[in-house]
């Protein structure tokens, strides 16, 4: 398996699709497994950046095909549940395994691609997880706590569990914090020895985009998403019966735009605070990936600014290194850490 990770707006999905296409044209089928925690939801398209056109790769004309042709790269774990549901890491692991086994059983190459570091790492490092049932008694007890109190309880449980299983988004809202506490409390009382996840060999490629370029692309993309109808998309989801609380639970675009729609924020404040939050999120993603390296994951970083053809070639050479030959310069792929 090949794994492609990177912060938001780094172009990792487009890279994964072009990489898959490079195998397909050689007769080796390849399919993408999404490692995004929000693109699993149907109808949450603009806010999650679910650009399905990224999975279409146009190939130039050649002797066999006199006109350009478009390859549609098969993808998995996108649009698999409804807004309002609470998809979690355990479900992701199970769905990932089903997709992985389906792809490999047909002789195709799986490419895991995503920016949700926790989800991706749960596969790479074989997290031993089990479903955590709802604890209504605990939820009732916690429902009267302030965010500061919930955060303190969560940090205490994490320390007892020696856990880095959840990131800072756990305390974005009381609902998220309570669920995180519920999970940590359950794991504290239940042993993990019998929770098996099969080892999967993978080469990890990290897309390293310069900080200033990342910020520019995030700002541009946010403006484009607003122009494409992100606010209307969220209004439609609310009108379909999904509660504001449930949408806020999904964070970032769905949190800030929902708060605008229900009158908790002005339009200008929503845009300003959302842009700041996305920049902070991208920085946390890079922090997580650096943590993966410290936890033993070898990440081969590639410069996002390289031409697509060169990036694909460098990845292919990393997977199957060519015979040594004199060449100028160094490889575009390096095992050093990416930009923060």
Model features per residue range: what roles?
Residues 36, 324-329, 337-339:
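Glycine-biased, low-complexity coil/linker segments
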Residues 1-320, 335:
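Phosphate/pyrophosphate-binding catalytic cores of soluble transferases and nucleic-acid-acting enzymes
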